[in-house]
Amino acid sequence: MTQIIPSLNGLRALSIFAVLISHIQDRSLHLQTSSGGQIGVNIFFVISGFLITLLLMKEEERNRSISLKDFFIRRSLRIFPVYFLLLFVYFILQNLSILDIPAGSWLTSLTYTRYFFDGEWETGHLWSLSVEEHFYLIWPFVFVYLKRKRITFAWSIIIIIPFVRLFTNISFMHHMFSRGDAIMWGCVFALYHQPLTRFIKAKPSYLMVLPFLLLLCCLASKKIFHVVGNDSTLYHVLQAFAGSYGTLTNICIGFITLISINYKHNLYYRFLNTTLMHHIGVLSYSIYIWQQLFFSEHIGPLSTFPYNIILIFVVAIISYYLVEQPFLRLKNHFIKQKPSEEPTAVPVLSTTP
């Protein structure tokens, strides 16, 4: 038995819209790119850390232990099929002389280290999946074997990484060492979700708009911070801690996630949980995987707006129902219940970049 956490697929839908709009601005309309795409990716990161940590907490509570083997099998069934299908399609297109992907991109894409290589457009988005995959390789072990140090580890990451962004002048923004704190903020909000939920519910409802307003300020951060001069120390401090993928952005996303789940009697909640938003959220991983190809100049008329957007959704739907869904069904075989207990309703929404 599974329980769908409300609003999260709606948030995923908003995230993928932000990424698509950013790419439409840049690749199709040749306009100055907004920061919406970066914030969209950070929403994916925060939600991913939040859900993975909740799942680990639920499994530990239910079974008094966590099966790392089952965890990695579930993650592999979720992430790998569509990811490697994309690379297989790229391989075919390269052999047809449609794409020209360098060896470095192939190597880093196949090994989930894409953020180490500044390559071509078509595999450029896979950096975020590399970040997430490395999170999967670290956090579950910390959670299982360093139980008393979980919170210390999480706080250490989210304190250190903003200073990495600062002292590198954010010169590698698509990197585990500059973006990993977004996922860890999701973990922290999961670890503290009960007291934070009580805190939110105890506050006047009109205050719930505050993280949304602050996130809009982060979205406009480049223009706002421009007044202090792009080369000034203050500018880099502001970008590292309050920019479009800075600390303030991640905190706002964390609170927005909890607000979106718990404040149910308003238009915003109903909007996030409409059938359309739910289904787009379900498709968001496939949309993210395939959208890069349809913004590529190498595929000719197929990349023309708005036809490319239609193609993205068509391919994502086919990909989800023919590839993702069959593997997702297999995941249920690796969710164990204690035989002496009734099945607990576990939130098993899949995580995406």
Provide a role label for each language-model segment.
Residues I4-K58, I79-V82, T113, A182-I183, ...:
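Functionally critical transmembrane alpha-helices in membrane proteins and complexes, commonly lining
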Residues P6, H30-V41, E120-V131, F167-W185, ...:
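Interfacial loop-to-helix transition and helix-capping segments at the boundaries
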Residues F17-I24, I92, T113-Y115, I158-T168, ...:
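Aromatic-anchored segments of alpha-helical transmembrane domains
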Residues Q38-V41, F45, K58-L93, S105-T108, ...:
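Transmembrane alpha-helical segments and their boundary/interface "anchor" motifs
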Residues I73, I79-V131, P162-L166, Y235-V237, ...:
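Membrane-interface helix-loop-helix regions
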Residues E133-I160, L191-M208:
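Solvent-exposed interhelical
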Residues V209-P326:
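Alpha-helical transmembrane segments of multi-pass integral membrane proteins
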Residues N273-L276, F327-P353:
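Membrane-proximal cytoplasmic C-terminal regulatory module of class A 7TM GPCRs
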